A protein has these predicted regions:
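Loop-helix junctions at membrane interfaces
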Residues: 1-257
Length: 257
């Protein structure tokens, strides 16, 4: 398990160094790290996955020219760690724990004094002839896509994911990657939002309208990247996945007996 964790940590470092987009309101970059989290979640139990993301984040932060510099006081690993942990829970059939984690994180975002449910009021007035342009929030809440992900999380789509990853065909595997990558990346996004609001305060309040407009496209790019990268990797590792999950099941059975 140590060797596997080290290997997947190294794998996580690679996309963590690559730029997806610039952050809004502060210096720094959003990286492509989310395109590989389904692989970590499938192979690693939550604790190992969190450890791998932590180490991978720290390594990437100190690689010259890396996009994965530390922007949130060293807590930058939290979003990716929760992403991997949630996927790991879902793959192992622990949907209740995954749902609690997701709902609790949404709650922490909502109660933060530097976040807003509807963000359109902070959108600046534009010059003529663009003064009519507005952010549609209200009526659309900032967390609209996160709520869609919550609906997917509690739906039948997250049942029997272990079988999809272990025995499903290419199409079924790609669908499973889509499901876990979407839910995981939305949890990672809201976790990043909590860090952003907590550390940058008024800057975050001014920035939410712009984040609202951009984040669906960024998340879509990460989910698409995860499908393209993780599906062939997991398909090629099908026998290894089955062996690891069988060993985990035997270990859990031994502990309960």
């Amino acid at each position: 398990m140590i060797t596997l964790t080290a290997s997947l940590t190294a794998l996580y470092v690679i996309p963590r160094t690559l730029v997806l987009d610039r952050l809004i309101g502060i210096s720094g970059n959003l990286t492509f790290s989310g395109i590989i989290t389904p692989v970590l979640g499938v192979f690693l139990a939550p604790s190992y996955g969190i450890f791998a993301v932590f180490i991978g984040t720290m390594i990437a932060a100190f690689i010259p020219g890396s996009a994965g510099t530390l922007k949130f006081g060293g807590l930058d690993f939290l979003g990716g760690a929760l992403n991997v942990a949630l996927i790991s829970l879902l793959v192992r059939g622990r949907r209740t724990e995954a749902t609690f984690m997701y709902v609790a994180t949404l709650g922490l975002f909502i109660i933060n004094p530097n976040t807003e449910i509807f963000v359109g009021s902070n959108f600046p007035s534009l010059p003529i002839p663009f003064q009519w342009l507005r952010v549609p929030s209200p009526p659309i809440p900032y967390l609209w896509l996160h709520l869609v992900a919550l609906g997917v999380l509690v739906s039948p789509l997250t049942r029997n994911l272990r079988d999809s990853f272990s025995f499903g065909g290419r199409r079924g595997l790609a669908k499973a990657v889509l499901v876990v990558a979407f839910i995981g990346t939305m949890l990672e996004h809201v976790t990043g939002g909590i860090l952003y609001a907590s550390l940058f305060g008024s800057v975050a309040l001014r920035s939410w309208p712009f984040v609202f407009l951009v984040y669906p496209f960024e998340r879509a790019a990460l989910v698409l990247g995860a499908i393209l990268v993780c599906t062939p990797l997991l398909l090629a590792s099908r026998d290894l996945i089955a062996r690891f999950h069988l060993r985990e099941a035997k270990t859990a059975q031994t502990r309960t007996s």
